[in-house]
Amino acid sequence: MPSLNEIRSTFLDYFGKADHAVTPSAPLVPQNDPTLLFVNAGMVPFKNVFTGAETPAHPRAASSQKCVRAGGKHNDLDNVGYTARHHTFFEMLGNFSFGDYFKEQAILHAWTLLTAEFKLPKDKLLVTVYHTDDEAADLWKKIAGLGDDRIIRIPTSDNFWSMGDTGPCGPCSEIFFDHGPHIAGGPPGSPDEDGDRFIEIWNLVFMQFEQLAGGERISLPKPSIDTGMGLERIAAVLQGQHDNYDIDLFKALIAASVELTGVKAEGAQAPSHRVIADHLRSSSFLLADGVSPSNEGRGYVLRRIMRRAMRHAYLLGASEPLMHRLAPTLVREMGQAYPELRRAEALIVETLRQEEERFRTTLGRGMGLLDEATANLAAGGVLDGETAFKLYDTYGFPLDLTQDAVRAKGLTVDTDAFDAAMQKQREMARANWAGSGQQGAAAAWFSIKEKAGATDFVGYETTETTGVVKAIVVDGAEVESASAGQTVEVLLDRTSFYAESGGQAGDTGVIEAHGRESRVLDTQKQAGELHVHRVELASDLKVGDQVVASVDADRRNTTRSNHSAAHLVHAALHHVLGPHVAQKGQMVDGERMRFDFSHGGPLTAEELDRIEAEVNEVIRQNVPAETKEMAPQEAIEAGAVALFGEKYGDSVRVLTLGKSLADEAKAYSVELCGGTHVARTGDIALFKIVSEQGVAAGVRRIEALTGEAARRFLLDQAGVAKALADQFKTPVAEVATRVDALIADRKRLEKELAEAKKQLALGGGGAASGPEDVNGTALIARVLDGVGGKELRGVAEEFKKQLASGVVALVGTSDGKAAVTVAVTADLTGKFSAADLAKAAVIAMGGQGAGGKADFAQGGAPDDSKAEEGLAAVKALLAG
């Protein structure tokens, strides 16, 4: 019985021998489609090839693509754990032809692989074709020898695929496996096709038409093939299972869950173990591909998945965080096929642990609220949307988690009321997911790239070069020429200008043409390989002009220093904090370095000092930086750090900086990076951290300066310290102690002043004048000059003690504003509300209202001259 890993290898090996380029899985975050939340099909990484926007590197390809369906249009989250074949994460095996072979060879490959390589019984297979696709039906008869009874014609869109309202489209042919008559269900197209007897295992898409906007459908000059076979589905068939969760991978994950929880995967507990196993896969792969749990976009979907699994761990009685202890089992099972899992194991374990610990603090209380809210609901009842919203807002329960929780009781949630209560949060959760760094290059640039080819970047060697204008773009449209005064985008055949990428800002400088220098405001990367200059033209410019492009060398040098320092910081963070640290983003330019990284809490002063000291020690080594071109896998196996979720080409640039502080024979920092960097570590000169802060849950940010900017910062700090020392007439080393003493003195004096004001207020009119009687109610009403809201509370409490029964109304005036405090003794709260009395006083004084309870309330007003009017309003209410 083949393992899942062996099945994947057999598929890829077969197509590799059939002259297909075996392509590694793309990251789960789409690189070329900002409209997609996650890669959800095998063809997504090839979308621009199918649309003609990109030229394929090879006319045939095959892959096992990581996919996630847990958000947006394609969302399987609710069903996971309760069905045999729903997953949030799955692998899609696929073979692709880009204008090369078509239907006959696609059908031949599929039939050969299934029957000759996988040795599936031919009589267990049947196929569907689009009802008008006679060609496909005839080919199935010719190649597989299938009769008409096993070639089912389907007239619906299930067997016709399209990319959208317009674009490539074509009929499909789906291959089904018959699990046998002992399982209920009929063949596709029959009334009982939804049964589980006949399971689709492979879909062949014959992309032969183009759908035009007017409704017309024309034939493509070079039809293509896109196929998809779910690895988990074919593994179940080949391992003699009817349920995906019974294949070897899930058996291992579920066994680990059973061992750690002590609860068997049987009966009502089985879905929980399945959810945990499935969600562990999607969570771990998303983390490995650079997604972090957050409250928006992709990060929020990840958090939903993680928390759903954590609730099921809670249902199984797990008393301690569970998910992070299962991660090593997943890495053992899938790490060979996906090395990024191994590289990210420390990050995965730490993030899962932190997220579960954070959620467990509210999970129990939230479940208690849910149990209380559903206690009196009968099966078929509806949980009110307000409670569901409270669970979300207060306890961190995503809506689908609440729905999952009440499902076991036969209940549903009033989602309309929930949506109305949390529209703002819902928008944040569902919208604003950005694409990758390129955010889907405009079609115009892909067209230009086809004509002009990739930019020849020579910026590693020089900051000045001569080039020829290959394209000019104005407001998104390609033009032949542009006039002085316009701001345009200019493409040269070769350039020394670095285009913004990997967090490094694009170069600025000048382009000289016709004896005039035009300012280059920015340089951006388009269509993957084009360095596009945004230029403020000082002279006319046309395609074909020869120009001299000169980078702002000073800005380039400071940017290089900041970028190299960021690499050193990354290495130092690993040494000081641990291997779980992963880069989450960076921005380096001519001003400073900003580095975002995964870590669970604020860094201590000692940790920051150690990081800063390490980086400066490597700078002082003043050793040459080394760069080398290598294959990505070769570089990673050699120890180079790759960014999680980044997709690399066939060759990568490997940058080595400094010597290890523990072993000089080893390097301090080795990373894959295409940016510009210093020639020697000593060129950085000096490194100084200026801030460290949190930017999201589990993500911290360090900002730092290098070189002259760092020196000026330290001089400024020294100047401030010297000025304070002169002011305090104390040595610089003792300034901090002196400031601490002054702060302590101020707090003590403020406390003494508040007490003095309180005593003055009480002594200035308390017992001597006594309360007045207002319609039978004792009232102490005072205007207290110079007393703020904080002091008023204590004064009101003291006055209240003097009354057996009554009301205290105080207005404190300070800096032209007024503070109102009202207190009511317990016996009168049924008759008078302090909140109502305070509100009346504040409104009479020109304010908006007050807050509080029946026995005590406070508010504020903008005009202290109306203090007596405020007290009069209180008296009026008491008088009835």
From Swiss-Prot:
<dbReference type="GO" id="GO:0004813">
    <property type="term" value="F:alanine-tRNA ligase activity"/>
</dbReference>
<dbReference type="InterPro" id="IPR009000">
    <property type="entry name" value="Transl_B-barrel_sf"/>
</dbReference>
<dbReference type="InterPro" id="IPR018164">
    <property type="entry name" value="Ala-tRNA-synth_IIc_N"/>
</dbReference>
<dbReference type="InterPro" id="IPR018165">
    <property type="entry name" value="Ala-tRNA-synth_IIc_core"/>
</dbReference>
<keyword id="KW-0694">RNA-binding</keyword>
<dbReference type="InterPro" id="IPR003156">
    <property type="entry name" value="DHHA1_dom"/>
</dbReference>
<keyword id="KW-0067">ATP-binding</keyword>
<protein>
    <recommendedName>
        <fullName>Alanine--tRNA ligase</fullName>
        <ecNumber>6.1.1.7</ecNumber>
    </recommendedName>
</protein>
<dbReference type="GO" id="GO:0005829">
    <property type="term" value="C:cytosol"/>
</dbReference>
<dbReference type="InterPro" id="IPR012947">
    <property type="entry name" value="tRNA_SAD"/>
</dbReference>
<keyword id="KW-0479">Metal-binding</keyword>
<feature type="binding site">
    <location>
        <position position="677"/>
    </location>
    <ligand>
        <name>Zn(2+)</name>
    </ligand>
</feature>
<dbReference type="InterPro" id="IPR018163">
    <property type="entry name" value="Thr/Ala-tRNA-synth_IIc_edit"/>
</dbReference>
<dbReference type="InterPro" id="IPR050058">
    <property type="entry name" value="Ala-tRNA_ligase"/>
</dbReference>
<keyword id="KW-0030">Aminoacyl-tRNA synthetase</keyword>
<dbReference type="InterPro" id="IPR002318">
    <property type="entry name" value="Ala-tRNA-lgiase_IIc"/>
</dbReference>
<dbReference type="Pfam" id="PF07973">
    <property type="entry name" value="tRNA_SAD"/>
</dbReference>
<feature type="binding site">
    <location>
        <position position="567"/>
    </location>
    <ligand>
        <name>Zn(2+)</name>
    </ligand>
</feature>
<dbReference type="GO" id="GO:0008270">
    <property type="term" value="F:zinc ion binding"/>
</dbReference>
<dbReference type="InterPro" id="IPR045864">
    <property type="entry name" value="aa-tRNA-synth_II/BPL/LPL"/>
</dbReference>
<dbReference type="Pfam" id="PF01411">
    <property type="entry name" value="tRNA-synt_2c"/>
</dbReference>
<keyword id="KW-0547">Nucleotide-binding</keyword>
<keyword id="KW-0820">tRNA-binding</keyword>
<dbReference type="InterPro" id="IPR023033">
    <property type="entry name" value="Ala_tRNA_ligase_euk/bac"/>
</dbReference>
<dbReference type="GO" id="GO:0045892">
    <property type="term" value="P:negative regulation of DNA-templated transcription"/>
</dbReference>
<dbReference type="GO" id="GO:0000049">
    <property type="term" value="F:tRNA binding"/>
</dbReference>
<comment type="similarity">
    <text>Belongs to the class-II aminoacyl-tRNA synthetase family.</text>
</comment>
<dbReference type="GO" id="GO:0005524">
    <property type="term" value="F:ATP binding"/>
</dbReference>
<keyword id="KW-0648">Protein biosynthesis</keyword>
<dbReference type="InterPro" id="IPR018162">
    <property type="entry name" value="Ala-tRNA-ligase_IIc_anticod-bd"/>
</dbReference>
<dbReference type="Pfam" id="PF02272">
    <property type="entry name" value="DHHA1"/>
</dbReference>
<feature type="binding site">
    <location>
        <position position="563"/>
    </location>
    <ligand>
        <name>Zn(2+)</name>
    </ligand>
</feature>
<dbReference type="GO" id="GO:0002161">
    <property type="term" value="F:aminoacyl-tRNA deacylase activity"/>
</dbReference>
<feature type="binding site">
    <location>
        <position position="673"/>
    </location>
    <ligand>
        <name>Zn(2+)</name>
    </ligand>
</feature>
<keyword id="KW-0963">Cytoplasm</keyword>
<comment type="function">
    <text>Catalyzes the attachment of alanine to tRNA(Ala) in a two-step reaction: alanine is first activated by ATP to form Ala-AMP and then transferred to the acceptor end of tRNA(Ala). Also edits incorrectly charged Ser-tRNA(Ala) and Gly-tRNA(Ala) via its editing domain.</text>
</comment>
<dbReference type="GO" id="GO:0006419">
    <property type="term" value="P:alanyl-tRNA aminoacylation"/>
</dbReference>
<keyword id="KW-0436">Ligase</keyword>
<keyword id="KW-0862">Zinc</keyword>
